């Protein structure tokens, strides 16, 4: 049979995922020199037309020795010929290799009438908003202040072009999801009938593929495109899921065309998402991109104290300081460390003090002792500024050495558990008041001097990587 021969050749030409998901389920019949292929829905036919119909036409003409000179792809509406569930695609990671990126419509469309209710998912794959993720429970600091202020502004100007889409980026565990969902929770509190949907990239892919398998693509589109606010977490994880990316951008363009707000998060700045098509990345930059940095030590302390207060836990400030000095990577690890301290405290039936904290974090302390030390910080700072190590710790007070020295002392205070006197000894035997002054100077310089602040952040990333 001609179609069987075509399938054999297509299997060789296409990836396993594309063949299994899009080609194998097609039903074929030959009528008067025309090979008709039947797909389960319009989306499927459009995909085949845009990506594989030319190849199929060439193969059909060759393998039929000229008998077939035309190939058509149609929606299968023939009685009794609906594809069985066993013939539906099973993979969730098909590659839509060359599908063109949809352009936003030039004119406004009349929005479809929708129910006056907030969108919630019956699917276990799609997450509902976390009621704890509110602005009042979000601890602000220098590292996240701009992101928090921008999210509040979005609420007052929902869908405004200058911040639509809003793209929050930064390493994992820094509160991007909290801020994103805080917008959703605040909108629903102000407008209970608003249609808000939060989903991860994974849940978008799973729900989209499921809609394909069940022939419910139109329902999926309607659910996604009738929103007031769409929140999508970890958008970078759509890389390699090209079929889902194409559908996402139809949704993206439809929502922007109606001035509906979109908020996305990623672990990288949009232009660093090199694994995505540049045309897709450019769309992420249409609105506003805001970075979220790892919290500084003051913010980490406040996060711990607020978390403890909300949980009814008595956490002394000196214990919060100690935890904040040891756990520097992200908020998630910080909260995990606090949970461990609380668990050990309750198990021992003892109040939280430094002994309980040290016992709880002994694994963390052991790892940090092997990785970040004052000596390590000195080496990295001297290499970064290209100055001799002996001058960094030496007595010279010229600016070329004094600024890096102050910066190194500030990093040592933030990243190690060493006391002021211990840090002073490591810097040529300086006394504790000199180290205290250096740390205070670092705080003020970071606020006054953007270049100094950028150097501090760069070194922090180097030391934590």
From Swiss-Prot:
Disulfide feature: none
Protein name: Chromosomal replication initiator protein DnaA
Subunit structure, as described in the record: Oligomerizes as a right-handed, spiral filament on DNA at oriC.
Region (Disordered): 81-123
Gene3D superfamilies named among the record's database cross-references: 1.10.1750.10, 1.10.8.60, 3.30.300.180, P-loop containing nucleotide triphosphate hydrolases (3.40.50.300)
Compositional bias of kind Low complexity: 88-100
Lineage, uppermost ranks: Bacteria, Pseudomonadati, Pseudomonadota, Gammaproteobacteria, Moraxellales
Chain spans, region Domain I, interacts with DnaA modulators: 1-87
């Amino acid at each position: 049979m001609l179609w069987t021969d075509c399938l054999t050749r297509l299997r060789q030409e296409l990836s396993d995922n594309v063949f299994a998901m899009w080609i194998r389920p097609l039903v074929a019949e030959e009528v008067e020199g025309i090979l008709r292929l039947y797909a389960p829905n319009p989306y499927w036919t459009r995909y085949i037309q845009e990506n594989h119909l030319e190849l199929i036409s060439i193969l059909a003409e060759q393998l039929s020795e000229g008998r077939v000179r035309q190939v058509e792809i149609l929606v299968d509406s023939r009685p009794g010929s609906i594809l069985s569930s066993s013939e539906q695609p099973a993979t969730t990671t098909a590659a839509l290799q060359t599908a063109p990126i949809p352009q936003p419509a030039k004119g406004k469309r009349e929005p479809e009438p929708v129910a006056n209710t907030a969108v919630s998912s019956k699917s276990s794959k799609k997450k509902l908003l976390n009621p704890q993720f509110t602005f009042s429970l979000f601890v602000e600091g220098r590292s996240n202040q701009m992101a928090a202020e921008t999210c509040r502004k979005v609420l007052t100007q929902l869908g405004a072009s200058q911040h639509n889409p809003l793209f929050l980026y930064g390493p994992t565990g820094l509160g991007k999801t909290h801020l994103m969902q805080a917008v959703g929770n605040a909108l629903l509190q102000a407008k209970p009938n608003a249609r808000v949907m939060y989903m991860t990239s994974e849940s978008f892919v799973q729900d989209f593929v499921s809609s394909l398998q069940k022939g419910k693509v139109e329902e999926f589109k309607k659910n996604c495109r009738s929103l007031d606010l769409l929140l999508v977490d970890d958008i970078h994880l759509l890389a390699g899921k090209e079929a889902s990316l194409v559908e996402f951008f139809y949704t993206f363009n439809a929502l922007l065309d109606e001035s509906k707000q979109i908020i996305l998060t990623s672990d990288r700045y949009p232009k660093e998402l090199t694994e995505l098509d540049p045309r897709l990345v450019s769309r992420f930059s249409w609105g506003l991109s805001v970075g979220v940095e790892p919290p500084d030590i003051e913010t980490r302390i406040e996060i711990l104290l607020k978390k403890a207060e909300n949980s009814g836990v008595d956490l002394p400030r000196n214990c919060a300081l100690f935890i904040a000095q040891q756990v520097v990577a992200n908020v998630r690890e910080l909260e995990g460390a606090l949970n461990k301290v609380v668990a050990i405290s309750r198990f021992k039936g003892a109040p939280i003090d430094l002994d309980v904290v040290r016992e709880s974090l002994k694994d963390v302390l052991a790892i940090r002792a092997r990785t970040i030390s004052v000596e390590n910080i000195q080496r990295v700072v001297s290499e970064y500024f290209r100055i001799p190590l002996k001058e960094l710790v030496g007595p010279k007070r010229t600016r070329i050495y004094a600024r890096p020295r102050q910066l190194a002392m500030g990093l040592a205070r933030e990243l190690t558990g060493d006391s002021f006197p211990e840090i002073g000894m490591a810097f040529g035997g300086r006394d504790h008041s000199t180290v205290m002054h250096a740390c205070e100077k670092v705080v003020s310089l970071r606020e006054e001097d953007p270049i100094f602040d950028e150097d501090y952040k760069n070194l922090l990333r180097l030391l934590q990587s």
